[in-house]
Design a protein with these regions (language model features):
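Residues in and immediately flanking transmembrane alpha helices
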Residues: 15-16, 201
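Bacterial N-terminal signal peptides
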Residues: 7-15
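Positively charged n-region of N-terminal signal peptides that target proteins for export
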Residues: 1-4, 20
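Non-catalytic cap/lid and distal C-terminal segments of serine-dependent acyl enzymes
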Residues: 21-25, 29-38, 44, 50-69, ...
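Residue-level detector of intrinsically disordered/flexible regions characterized by low predicted structural confidence
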Residues: 4-5, 339
Length: 367
């Protein structure tokens, strides 16, 4: 029997080996300094990225097209060569992850050279402009323990539907079975979904590194959807997401995982719209949270915020949650507010809160 299996295996392998050269794609050498983007599909050479210049080359095979555009922060016209291939080399791009699309004769499609990512409310292409060694914090480190990211469905009584959530557990979770963990609820921004933090954002690698370096305590990170499907036929961003978080999600997580269930061990943070959902949820449920963070998502109205208008007083914002500064500081251990250097940030609002006497607040600007 073993000899028969061996013979069959040799025959199969021989067929595979002889078939491979005929199936292998023709790989053209890339221009000097360029490498395939880390977001590319397995056999795709393009888009290609130059880490030193931060430029990218995009390639689209569309011989019958009359116009092709790269849509990456704007519309960029691509040029066609004599083989029907369209090309463009960008100006230097900002480091980090970028969504993009390709418009062929005005119809926007994803670039089949890359994996797809859910952003701007559709499955688009993505490209990563890598940092240097300073970006190692979000890269996989083979020398440290790694946690798990679990994909879970739970039932929402508020929504009347099943909902999806991703949950990060630290590397020690399965071996340290008597230990309970604090929980961070981390909410995505508008146009993205609950997968963005772990895929585009490399959240798992970041948490693994912080925990291994002793810069973060081992914790559970819950990444829910910030959208609401109001009925089986319509998906919409409207609705009371706070009720789903508080009445459905938190009880489910506390029942399913070994969590510390008191407010001192529960935090919430969010990006953009997720930051606004975070402030709405936490400031209306101060008995359940002691830590809060917003990334480009803190807005009290007016005071340099989007839309202008008359600023509410610090005492009336969020139904008066800041009115008694000492009481706020007693309940909230940290209010972390961050924004990008290119954004119209909430610094004036933070300054007003500090002047009012709020001490447990940190403001940060990043690239």
């Amino acid at each position: 029997m073993r000899k028969v299996i061996l013979v069959i295996t040799v025959i199969l392998l021989s067929g595979i080996i002889t078939a491979q050269p005929g199936r292998a794609p023709q790989v053209e050498p890339l221009p000097a300094g360029f490498k395939p983007s880390s977001t590319n599909t397995f056999i795709s050479q393009y888009p290609a990225v130059n880490q030193q210049t931060r430029q990218a080359i995009f390639r689209v095979v569309a011989p019958d097209a009359t116009s092709v555009q790269l849509r990456l922060g704007g519309n960029m016209e691509m040029k066609k060569d004599d083989k029907g291939v369209w090309w463009i080399t960008t100006e230097p791009l900002v480091v980090g992850f970028h969504y993009y699309g390709i418009a062929i004769n005005g119809v926007e499609v994803a670039d089949r050279g890359t994996k797809t990512y859910f952003g701007s409310n559709w499955e688009s292409s993505g490209i990563e402009i890598p940092e240097g060694p300073e970006g190692d914090y979000y890269r996989f480190n083979k020398n440290i323990p790694h946690g798990q990211i679990r994909s879970i469905l739970y039932w929402s009584e508020v929504n009347g539907l099943e909902r999806h959530v991703n949950v990060y557990v630290p590397a020690e979770y399965e071996s340290n079975t008597n230990k309970r963990y604090p929980v961070l609820y981390l909410v995505h921004g508008w146009g993205e979904d609950e997968n963005g933090w772990s895929i585009q954002g490399h959240m798992g690698n970041i948490m693994d590194g912080l925990i291994a370096a002793g810069k973060a305590v081992p914790m559970i990170v819950v990444m829910p959807s910030g959208d609401i499907q109001t009925n089986p036929d319509v998906r919409t961003a409207s609705g009371n997401i706070t009720d789903i978080f508080v009445k459905d999600l938190i009880p489910f997580i506390d029942k399913t995982f070994r969590t510390k269930t008191d407010r001192q061990n529960r935090a919430m943070a969010g990006l953009s719209r997720g930051g606004m959902q975070t402030t709405t949820t936490v400031f209306s449920n101060m008995d359940k949270f002691a830590w809060i963070g917003t990334f480009s998502g803190f807005f009290m109205g007016g005071m340099g915020g989007p839309g202008g208008g008359t600023a509410p007083s610090v005492e009336t914002a969020f139904n008066g949650v800041f009115k008694d500064a000492a009481a706020f500081d007693k309940q909230i251990n940290l209010l972390f507010i961050s924004t990008g250097t290119e954004e119209r940030g909430p610094k004036e609002q933070v300054d007003a809160l500090k002047a009012h006497g709020i001490k447990h607040i940190v403001y940060h600007e990043s690239q």
